[in-house]
UniProtKB/Swiss-Prot annotation:
Xref: InterPro entries: KsgA/Erm, rRNA_Ade_diMease-like_C, rRNA_Ade_Mease_Trfase_CS, rRNA_Ade_methylase_Trfase_N, rRNA_adenine_dimethylase, SAM-dependent_MTases_sf
Gene3D superfamilies: Ribosomal RNA adenine dimethylase-like, domain 2, Vaccinia Virus protein VP39
Protein EC: 2.1.1.182
Keyword Signal: no
Gene Ontology MF, one: 16S rRNA (adenine(1518)-N(6)/adenine(1519)-N(6))-dimethyltransferase activity
Organism of derivation: Gluconobacter oxydans (strain 621H) (Gluconobacter suboxydans)
Protein name stated in the entry: Ribosomal RNA small subunit methyltransferase A
């Protein structure tokens, strides 16, 4: 299979690239000659496993554009989740990042990643763990970023976990299914606006930076993908306030077609809404992030 994307993909990706004017990544001063990614995959007999939500991104040009979303990585630590055969990993190592930690649960990929680490003995570190059970912020010193093509089946819980400790991260550049990326960045009143949008936008500024079609992956997924760039705010909620927000948004959007006085009943909704000066007949999707923040503060204070 050719590593060049089809013409339809090139047009789509070029349009996204030009609209964002993402600069190319800076290369380190010492070039490393690596075997081709496809040859490496073939030599190790690695294929994407559906049960792990894997879709390998092999095009080096696209991987470079994703790595560039981190900005100038000089002196930064980068964590990548689910590197698989290492296509994006190679692009990250081709930036000035001081170190790259890759977290991989699939033991079939470990020998391949270990082999890549021999070319970058002081920069690439292979972490053989389940990212859902790992405090990724403990892997490397700050300032640190996460840049990753996330496994689809664990992408949302991973993001929520990182939002709980958003102060630990300078930036998150994460690939999701397009629908999930749009939910993260959705505005109030839209059908995509929900719990994920409120939690994400409460803690960070969020934008969809790149849209990538199925043809860019092996095997091609059934849906389009997108990279969301999430930049945490300077001030972050306390862990207690974050839990209060999770409770409010879970109740509000768990019954999103109901009026708030009904959907929030289990947490004393009538009283909270009155204190927040929010009409109890409104529905969850009409509230701004700031209004949800006020409800979370009142919810915490009432405990």
């Amino acid at each position: 299979m050719s590593s060049r994307p089809p013409a339809s993909f090139s047009a789509t990706f070029s349009a996204a690239r030009s609209s964002k004017c993402v600069p190319p990544p800076r290369r380190p001063s010492t070039d490393v000659s690596l075997p081709s990614l496809r040859d490496t995959i073939q030599a190790h007999g690695l294929d994407a496993k559906k049960s792990l939500g894997q879709h390998f991104l092999l095009d080096p040009g696209i991987c470079a554009r994703i790595a560039a979303l981190g900005g100038d990585l000089t002196g930064r630590s980068v964590v990548e989740i689910g590197p698989g055969p290492g296509g994006l990993t190679r692009a990250l190592l081709d930036t000035p990042a001081s170190r790259v930690d890759v977290v991989e649960i699939d033991e079939r990929a470990w020998p391949l990643l270990d082999e890549l680490a021999t070319y970058y003995p002081d920069r690439l570190h292979v972490v053989r763990q389940d990212a859902l059970k790992l405090d990724a912020a403990t892997l490397a010193p700050a300032p640190r970023q996460i840049i990753a093509n996330l496994p689809y089946n664990v992408a949302t819980p991973l993001l929520v976990g990182w939002l709980r400790q958003a102060s630990q991260w300078e930036r998150l550049s994460l690939m999701f299914q397009l629908e999930v990326a749009e939910r993260i960045c959705a505005a109030p009143g839209s059908s995509a606006y929900g719990r994920l949008a409120v939690l994400s936008q409460w803690c960070a500024s969020c934008s969809v930076a790149l849209r990538i079609p199925p043809a860019a992956f092996s095997p091609p997924p059934k849906v389009h993908s997108a990279v969301a760039v999430i930049i945490p705010h300077a001030e972050q909620p306390s862990p207690q306030l974050f839990r209060a927000m999770e409770q409010v948004t879970a109740a509000a959007f768990g019954q999103r077609r109901k009026m708030l006085r009904s959907s929030l009943k289990s947490i004393g909704g009538e009283r909270l809404l009155e204190q927040a000066e929010i009409e109890p007949t409104r529905r969850a999707e009409t509230l701004s992030v700031a209004e949800f923040a006020r409800l979370a503060e009142l919810n915490l204070a009432s405990r």
